[in-house]
Amino acid sequence: LELAILMPLFLLIVAGVIDYGLLFWEKVVITNAVREGARAASRAADQGFGAKAELSPYQVRQVVQNYLDSAGVKAPNGQHLILSDETFSYFWSDTGSGIYLTVVLQNIPYRMLLLPAAQSIFSGRNSEEDLIYLNARITMAAEWTEPPTP
């Protein structure tokens, strides 16, 4: 009898540990993808008279996209996650103490695998609202002195 009472609670806890572990993994992957994009964006090609950025903003986005694809990050519908202008941004600023570039991933959707139904029960939301949105932002010093061309 005690097992019948405690088993559903135990299974819910195990499912929560698995789901939140996967959520944490995806957050780490997204952060690493942004970091790889910033590293690629910060590199400079020496042209003798000044350093120019090696990669265009589109190429930086492709570096981040390739990292996400290789890690197997998926959209909530199970398809590959495709970065758009709403989810990816890359910009730079000259602060006087150097040029800094920032790579941002925002509103990357994640759907819990085992607990979406339980999440709806406890929160009163419908399945369309089950998404959790992850963000990652990295700012890094640029090696170049001449900004990239779009």
Predicted regions, residues:
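Alpha-helical assembly-interface signal, strongest on the long, hydrophobic N-terminal helix that forms
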Residues: 1-68
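Short, conserved structural patches
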Residues: 40-150
